Amino acid sequence: MHEMSIAMSIVDAVDAKARAEGAVRISLIELKIGKLAGILPEALRFCFSAAATGSLAGQAQLVIDEPDGRGRCSDCGHEFSVDFYYARCPECGSLRIVIVSGEEFLIQSIIIDEEGE
């Protein structure tokens, strides 16, 4: 389960950023994880709750945006939804597909609470 190491990396990154900004806690973390990123959001949520214990993110709400996969045919240029890496173009039948979205994995934003808030 690589989601645990991913959760730990997220906690480390947001904790460091929040501390640099003088935060006393992180209240919200927004992630963007494409459906083709190879990360299971529910497993990540489970791991995050354990990884965040004792950190500034310990009580943070985790919001995950999951953009769909999109592919573009290298032969005809048609763009379409894909659920997996090996897709056939629905327009011309080509297997020469380039994934154009759905592989994203990033920390979109964090909301911090500073002393006195």
UniProtKB/Swiss-Prot annotation:
Similarity comment text for this entry: Belongs to the HypA/HybF family.
InterPro entries per the UniProt record, alphabetical: Hydgase_Ni_incorp_HypA/HybF_CS, HypA/HybF
GO biological process, one term: protein maturation
NCBIfam families named among the record's database cross-references: hypA
Residues the entry annotates as binding Zn(2+): C73, C76, C89, C92
Gene3D superfamilies linked: 3.30.2320.80
Protein role: Involved in the maturation of [NiFe] hydrogenases. Required for nickel insertion into the metal center of the hydrogenase.
UniProt protein name: Hydrogenase maturation factor HypA
Keywords recorded for this protein, A-Z: Metal-binding, Nickel, Zinc
Source taxon at top rank: Bacteria
Molecular function, one GO term: zinc ion binding
Residues noted as binding Ni(2+) in the record, renumbered to the chain: H2
